[in-house]
Structure formats: C-alpha cells, structure tokens
C-alpha cells in the first residue's frame, strides 16, 4: 500500500499561520490596554493629565514647559490673546444689600492685572501649606511720609496683586484668609501711603488677603464703627474670609513681624503708636488697627452703629469682647510700633458728646445695636488694581 505524503506548505498550512498572527495581535492589544491602565493610574485617575504623561502637547502646554503657560507656580492662568474672564469678585449683577447698580470694575493699572485670573481652587490643593511664620519677613522698616506716591507705580511694583486688591501666595496655601477693612472719607493721600507700605508687608506675611475701602458718602457726620460693619458684610459677598483686620487709613506698621491676621483671641495690632510716644495709652485701648476672626466678630454682634463722630466706639468694642469672655492679645511694644500720618481733625468728625454715656451701657445695648440692626445702601463699587472701594450711604444720626 502506498503511504500518503505528509502535508507540506500550501493552503493546508494556512489555519496554523492565521492562528499565530491572531495570538500576536491579542497579546499586543492586551499590552496596550495594560499600558493605558498604568498611565491612567499614575495620573491619579485624572484624564486631563494623560497628554502630559504620554508626551502629547495640549493647548495650555503649547509644546513647552507648562509652568510658563500657567504663570509658573503662581496659580494664575495666563489667557494670552483670549478675552479674559472678569476680575475676581466682579459681577454684572446687582450687589446684594445695595442698590440696583451693577458692580463696576475700573481704575488704572498694569495690563498684567487685567489679563490673569486665579485658577480653580482645586489646583491650590496640590500646594503645601504656608509655614506658621513666613521666611520672607525683614523686621523693622523705615517709614517716611515725605515723598509723593504714584499708585500706578505701586501697582507695577506689586504685579501679583490682582484687581480689587486681592492677593494669595504663589507657592503655598495660606491658612489666613484676611479681609482688611478701612473706614474712609476724603483721605486719598493717606490711602496712597497705606497701599504703598502695606501691600509688600502683607505679601511677605504670606496672607490670602483683600483690601476694602469703605467710603462714607455725603458730608454727614462720620461713623467709623458702622463703616466697619458694612465692610464685614460686603467683603463676605466676595470671598470666604475667616479673619477681618480693621485699620485706620493713617496708621502704618514699622515692623513686618506685626502680623495682620487673627489669633485665638481678638488681636490689637497698633499697640505702640508714635502719637502716644510708642506706648499703650491705657490698658483698655483697642483703637487704630485690630483683628477679629469671623466667629469672634459674630459673637459680639459686630460693632456699634450709634457712635456718630469721633471717639468711644473702640471702648465699646473692648467692652463687648470682655462681656463675651474674650481677652485682648497684643504683640510686644517693639514689634507693635506704628507711625501715624499727621493730620488735622476732619470736618464732620467732631468728638461725640454722647460717647461716655453710651460706653457705660454697652452691656445693655450690644444685643440690639450691631450687625442685627445694620442698615445701609451701597451706592457704588469700584475695583482698582490695589483695592476695592465701596461707597455707601449709612444714613444720619437718629
């Protein structure tokens, strides 16, 4: 019998070769799937980072270092030729608690302040927390008031301060979200000096801060404490501030270790003014510059609204704090030194003849005179490169 010849190459061998190619393809697909899964895992399950990990350019990267496109590590998105979003806190809607006028963002300033906006808050979470004591502090400073101040130049010297006077550290997350409230009327030259000196100090202190100048409209008698209440209410409409520094416009610290932030107890900052021979005039003194946390401020029902004219409201505030079981913390007299810009008494800010009687009744009046009785009307909001000015009608003495 003739034996059948074994199968040689030809059509009968094709099924084995096809199977081999199919197996190779399956292995390649599995390897690709495993690679994509690994990259996805390394990206922290954030698909937006996949192009960076695999070396593909994105519109923000532009084929170069991504830090340059997002303002290095500043947490600010440079928008290039695109029309920028509104500055921080800007809105075309009426401001709550005010009139129907829209919020207006205007004022001169460098273009860099107009073409950059903060990145989403989630980006800041990747930054480390700022240290308890800033390494940028320099200590004692020479404070002089004998040179003119140009606010456009001040803005250029502080390029990281954003429209409306907002700033946050570039390379760490500050635990101190501070609104600085300045009661104001007809003190433009003093405000220039304040902005010139304080913006660098506040940045070296690594604060997340905003500057609010609360301008009393009209020529009725001045009411400092009521303007501070207004500043508290209005600042919270912009940002989740947790600390409030209340500062007269004519006081400048002489040492940047004097922290413009809040502590476990209410803080008196201007403890050694040149006006008083660099000493505390009396133990209960709480005037000039002070800081209260949001909770501390709410606990005392804010500040009194019925102190029209000069004097008395600081002592009323001190009484409120004591009646709520709080004590005053202060820096030492060396760190707490401040200089006052000399000036004559403002018109419509004469001494309040009722102040001593009102101070004597703080315990009875603090429950009904404060945030819960505050009335005012916002007339205008202007956001300048170095500060936000809110002009308000706070009424007249009843």
From Swiss-Prot:
The biological processes this protein is annotated with in GO are: acute inflammatory response; angiogenesis involved in wound healing; binding of sperm to zona pellucida; cell adhesion; development of secondary sexual characteristics; epithelial cell development; epithelial cell proliferation; extracellular matrix organization
Cytoplasmic-side segments: 1-24
The record lists the catalysed reaction(s) as:
D-glucose + UDP-alpha-D-galactose = lactose + UDP + H(+); an N-acetyl-beta-D-glucosaminyl derivative + UDP-alpha-D-galactose = a beta-D-galactosyl-(1->4)-N-acetyl-beta-D-glucosaminyl derivative + UDP + H(+); N-acetyl-D-glucosamine + UDP-alpha-D-galactose = beta-D-galactosyl-(1->4)-N-acetyl-D-glucosamine + UDP + H(+); a beta-D-GlcNAc-(1->3)-beta-D-Gal-(1->4)-beta-D-Glc-(1<->1)-Cer(d18:1(4E)) + UDP-alpha-D-galactose = a neolactoside nLc4Cer(d18:1(4E)) + UDP + H(+)
**Gene Ontology MF annotations:** alpha-tubulin binding; beta-N-acetylglucosaminylglycopeptide beta-1,4-galactosyltransferase activity; beta-tubulin binding; galactosyltransferase activity; identical protein binding; lactose synthase activity; manganese ion binding; N-acetyllactosamine synthase activity
Transmembrane region(s): 25-44
Q: Which Pfam families match?
A: Glyco_transf_7C (PF02709), Glyco_transf_7N (PF13733)
Q: Which cysteines are joined by disulfide bonds?
A: 130-172, 243-262
Which Gene3D superfamilies has this protein been placed in? Spore Coat Polysaccharide Biosynthesis Protein SpsA, Chain A
Q: Where does UDP-alpha-D-galactose bind?
A: 183-187, 222-224, 249-250, 310, 343-346
Q: Which UniProt keywords apply?
A: Cell membrane, Cell projection, Congenital disorder of glycosylation, Disease variant, Disulfide bond, Glycoprotein, Glycosyltransferase, Golgi apparatus, Lipid metabolism, Manganese, Membrane, Metal-binding, Secreted, Signal-anchor, Transferase, Transmembrane, Transmembrane helix
Tell me which residues are marked as the site Cleavage.
Answer: 77-78
What this protein is called in its record is: Beta-1,4-galactosyltransferase 1
Q: Which organism is it from?
A: Homo sapiens (Human)
